[in-house]
Amino acid sequence: MTGARAAPAIRRPARAQLLGAVLALLVAAACLGQAGWIHAKAWLAQALIERAYVSGGPPWPWADTRPVAKLLLPGAARPLYVLAGGSGRNLAFGPALDSASVLPGAAGNSIISGHRDTHFRSLAGLAVGDRIEVERRDGAAITFVVAALNVVDSRRARLALDVDRPQLTLVTCYPFDAIHPNGPLRFVATAVPAAEL
């Protein structure tokens, strides 16, 4: 018998492998989409918070927080807008000022937290001596100089609130490239007003 041979039929194991590969690609796409959504939300929120910083109103109609300061970190292309109240909900949208701390530049410790993989990812390159610019909503502008960088265990260490002079403390999760979120380690950058040096 001469002529073309019939194409072999796809065997069952090959179909199962194909289905498995398609499912794996769908799961991977969903994971990447979720990661992209987190970064997109963080970027969009900062744009809305910037508008609220200028106008004095809430960043969105249902918000129970307001921007209190603008923060410019070394090497950052854009300023970050800091929300009042260090809740997890606020941290999803931007850096947040701890409710128990003072406004930047006031006597006491101003503690601002942010996520290591979005707003505070640039803290990984921070060095002692770097300058951090802060502008409060009331127009006061303060330049801080990084005095110390530490990694602490949040289960054991507590941040002092009752310091006798203005101090800025930036806090984020550590290590910066951690695979699992919510570990106990925190990267803590302590800064003092440049005018006091």
Named regions from a protein language model:
Residues P13-L197:
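Solvent-exposed, non-transmembrane regions of membrane-associated and secreted proteins
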Residues M1-A14:
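N-terminal Lys/Arg-rich, disordered targeting/topogenic segments
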